[in-house]
């Protein structure tokens, strides 16, 4: 079967061509896919150059010195669904090419080069001059308008520019902002993942220290149980304080990521608006929001070693050795025998507070 002939019914009118073109837009450069086109494991497509750009933004340390290509390995997230893409030693060049999409692009370009008599471009009309199309952009008032408004109307003293020029400029500006947000979101996600690992390390270290405390206190007599409980409570408090702080940071980063992702989605939807004037009516606000979101400064991450719980290590060997010297004392009263362990407990507490003691 000839693929071109079988595909032509989908390209029969302007509406179908517009719908098809939307499916052939790269989510990174916001232009039609450029060859080679690679397909990700999540089945989304990217220009290989754009995939390389996203990978380098997410993995700056993997970039070869003095080169713009990545030699091997690494990972990044799909800008469409956030699925993590793990690369082999060939980097983005190890991703499979989507020859079907490349063929569709070739067919689309061939068909779109032919005149479509049924295709009639729609224009927004000027509210002041109902028979005039909106065809210029007022730089002073930052609104689309018509030629009569410039000659006779409210914008006669304003500076204007052709509508396509401002359309391309602001679309490029918004595209750059979206690319920065996508790269920033990958970095935020990496920070969240690192802090989740910090939480796990804190829990693991706390669990290990509790086990160590239990093992050491099992060799002591009952008079040390109260001290053991106090140390466990201190450890639990520190663990909870650290976990609360890190989880609070995770929530903050997560909220920022959610807000940023929603803004990216809104901006991408705006980029799909085919009408230049309608697009420009809302582009400025989106550009400002994207710029403001890109400049948001998040709280700092926990300092190195924050997950360590080594300060709760307890040395009881010298205390156990001292307790092993306790023996019957001929002639001692039962009251003295009961008081003696309390004195030992006090000595043990003093020894624990002096890490340099014998």
Curated annotation (Swiss-Prot):
Coiled coil: 194-258
Entry's Gene Ontology molecular function annotations: zinc ion binding
Residues given in the record as Zn(2+) binding sites: 126, 129, 149, 155
GO cellular component: microtubule; Z disc
Subcellular location: Cytoplasm, Cytoskeleton; Cytoplasm, Myofibril, Sarcomere, Z line
Keywords for the protein's UniProt record, in alphabetical order: Coiled coil, Cytoplasm, Cytoskeleton, Developmental protein, Differentiation, Metal-binding, Microtubule, Zinc, Zinc-finger
Span of zinc fingers (B box-type): 121-163
Residue ranges, compositional bias (Acidic residues): 334-345
Region named Disordered: 326-358
Cysteine pairings via disulfide bonds: none
Region Mediates microtubule-binding and homooligomerization: start-end pairs: 168-211
Alphabetical list of Pfam families matching this protein: zf-B_box, zf-RING_UBOX
Protein purpose: May bind and stabilize microtubules during myotubes formation.
Subunit text: Homooligomer and heterooligomer. Interacts with TRIM63 and probably with TRIM55. Interacts with tubulin.
PANTHER family the record matches: E3 UBIQUITIN-PROTEIN LIGASE TRIM (PTHR24103)
Listed name of the protein: Tripartite motif-containing protein 54
Species this protein is from: Pongo abelii (Sumatran orangutan)
């Amino acid at each position: 079967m000839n693929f071109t002939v079988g595909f032509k019914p989908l390209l029969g009118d302007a509406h179908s061509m517009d719908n098809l073109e939307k499916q052939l837009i790269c989510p990174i450069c916001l232009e039609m896919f450029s060859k080679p086109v690679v397909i990700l494991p999540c089945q989304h497509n990217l220009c290989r150059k754009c995939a390389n750009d996203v990978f380098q933004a997410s993995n700056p340390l993997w970039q070869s010195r003095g080169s713009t290509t990545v030699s091997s390995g690494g990972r990044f997230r799909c800008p469409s669904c956030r699925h993590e893409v793990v690369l082999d030693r060939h980097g983005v060049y190890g991703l499979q090419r989507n020859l079907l999409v490349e063929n569709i692009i070739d067919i689309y370009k061939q068909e779109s080069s032919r005149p479509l008599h049924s295709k009639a471009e729609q224009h927004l009309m000027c509210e002041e001059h109902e028979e005039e199309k909106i065809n210029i952009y007022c730089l002073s008032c930052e609104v689309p308008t018509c030629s009569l408004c410039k000659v006779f109307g409210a914008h006669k003293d304003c500076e204007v520019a052709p509508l396509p020029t401002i359309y391309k400029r602001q679309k490029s500006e918004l595209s750059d902002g979206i690319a920065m947000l996508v790269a920033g979101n990958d970095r935020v996600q990496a920070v969240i993942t690192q802090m989740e690992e910090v939480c796990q390390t804190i829990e693991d270290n706390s669990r290990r220290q509790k086990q160590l405390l239990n093992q050491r206190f099992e060799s002591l007599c009952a008079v040390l149980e109260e001290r053991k409980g106090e140390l466990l409570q201190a450890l639990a408090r520190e663990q909870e304080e650290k976990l609360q702080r890190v989880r609070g940071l995770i929530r903050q980063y997560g909220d920022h990521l959610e807000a940023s992702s929603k803004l990216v989605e809104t901006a991408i939807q705006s980029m799909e608006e085919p009408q230049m004037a309608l697009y420009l009516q809302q582009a400025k606000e989106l550009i400002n929001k994207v710029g403001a979101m890109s400049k948001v400064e998040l709280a700092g991450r926990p300092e190195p070693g924050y997950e360590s719980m080594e300060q709760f290590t307890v040395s009881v060997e010298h205390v156990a050795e001292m307790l092993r010297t306790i023996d019957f004392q001929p002639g001692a009263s039962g009251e003295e025998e009961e008081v003696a362990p309390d004195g030992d407990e006090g000595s043990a507490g003093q020894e624990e507070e002096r890490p340099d003691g014998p």
